[in-house]
């Protein structure tokens, strides 16, 4: 199978990136934390074998260009009015460019490591949908064998029901869903502290 993965990331713009961390870290600290998480994700996906990887940014930014060069990863721009539209577009683009199974992954889920992604790749031949549920009720990774616009439209992004609603829609459509182990994302100050503790980061970013 031809597999493809789009890593989604926001441009590191002060005041617009990791806003829930700003109270604890300040604007510059939140941006630095975001960059560290993106680089963690890029390091993990760069270790994958047999899967095309792309970095999909929210907007053009010099740091993104530097990441593209440093990690030898193609750079793309997200398109769409909301997160669902942007994910659907990225999945559709990957599938239309020859991928037999395509993934979209968030950049702030540190436990989506090479082993997890290798597992997801191993399930792609027997699934219509692969999803990595997050502790906050969302998900950090979704993969599809075919475009499924209904999984992304009218979804309450940012709520704790995104995963449950996505799963329900997929099952009602008769899609075969494979669910991975629960993951967590870095969104709040306590998540950042957890990341620092588990991944050996010390002090402020």
List the predicted regions and their residue ranges.
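A short, N-terminal amphipathic alpha-helix
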Residues: 32-51
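Short, glycine-/small-residue-rich phosphate/pyrophosphate-handling segment
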Residues: 148-169
């Amino acid at each position: 199978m031809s597999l493809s993965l789009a890593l989604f990331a926001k441009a590191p713009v002060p005041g617009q990136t990791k806003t829930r961390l700003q109270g604890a870290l300040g604007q510059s600290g939140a941006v630095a934390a975001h960059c560290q998480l993106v680089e963690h994700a890029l390091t993990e996906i760069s270790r994958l074998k047999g899967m095309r990887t792309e970095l999909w940014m929210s907007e053009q930014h010099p740091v993104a260009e530097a990441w593209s060069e440093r990690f030898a990863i193609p750079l793309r721009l997200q398109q769409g009015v909301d997160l669902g539209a942007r994910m659907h577009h990225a999945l559709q683009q990957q599938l239309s460019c020859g991928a037999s199974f395509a993934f979209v992954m968030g950049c702030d889920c540190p436990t989506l490591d090479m082993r997890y992604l290798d597992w997801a790749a191993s399930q792609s031949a027997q699934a219509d949908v692969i999803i990595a549920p997050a502790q906050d009720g969302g998900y950090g990774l979704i993969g599809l064998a075919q475009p499924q616009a209904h999984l992304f439209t009218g979804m309450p992004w940012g709520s704790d029901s995104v995963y449950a609603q996505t799963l329900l829609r997929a099952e009602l459509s008769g899609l075969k869903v494979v669910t991975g182990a629960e993951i967590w994302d870095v969104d709040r100050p306590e998540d950042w502290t957890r990341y620092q503790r588990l991944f050996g980061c010390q002090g402020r970013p």
